[in-house]
Design a protein with these regions (language model features):
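N-terminal signal-anchor/start-transfer transmembrane helix
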Residues: 24-42
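Transmembrane alpha-helical segments of integral membrane proteins
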Residues: 64-67, 90-101
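Loop-to-helix transition at the N-terminal end of transmembrane alpha-helices
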Residues: 44-60, 81
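Juxtamembrane boundary at the C-terminal end of a transmembrane helix
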Residues: 121-132
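Hydrophobic transmembrane alpha-helical segments in integral membrane proteins
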Residues: 2-29
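Structural signature of hydrophobic alpha-helical transmembrane segments
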Residues: 19-27, 76-89
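Membrane-interface helix-boundary motifs at transmembrane edges
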Residues: 40-50, 100-108
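A generic, lipid-embedded transmembrane alpha helix
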Residues: 56-70
Length: 132
């Protein structure tokens, strides 16, 4: 887990990419806890929670854009699976929303909470395959 804290370079895009990865990991964990809490107490996703999920998606997209900038500058991840984890990070929340009842039922809280938990795993794998 020390790779979560290590910064070994002076490239601004790379520093941003690593920082956004950590932010995405933490934020997705918070979204998982919040969604599962809503499910446990029997409530559908609140407007605030749905808005927070949009921010999580925005962070995933921003991470992807910075990753593309890095690629154009000649940087490459340690493992090519890193690209797959990036795509999965971007499509997971829209997929969960597509499977849901548009955020109106208690079950949707479960879907979004589990999607957040899944994204924690995706973020950890993305960090692991990007570092080298």
């Amino acid at each position: 887990m020390t790779y979560l804290l290590a910064v070994k370079h002076d490239s601004l895009p790379l520093t941003l990419h690593q920082g956004f990865a950590r932010a995405f990991l933490i934020y997705s964990a918070l979204m998982a806890v919040w969604g599962l809490f809503l499910y446990i107490i029997g409530r559908p996703p609140s407007g605030g929670y749905l808005g927070a999920l949009v921010l999580d998606e925005g962070l995933a997209l921003l991470q992807g854009v910075v990753g593309l900038v890095l690629r154009t500058q000649g940087h490459a991840p340690h493992d090519a699976l890193h690209y797959l984890y990036g795509v999965v990070a971007v499509v997971s929340l829209p997929a969960a929303y597509y499977m849901s009842d548009e955020g109106t039922t208690r079950r949707d809280s479960l879907y979004f909470g589990l999607a957040g938990l899944f994204l924690v795993g995706v973020a950890l794998r993305g960090i692991g395959t990007g570092s080298g």
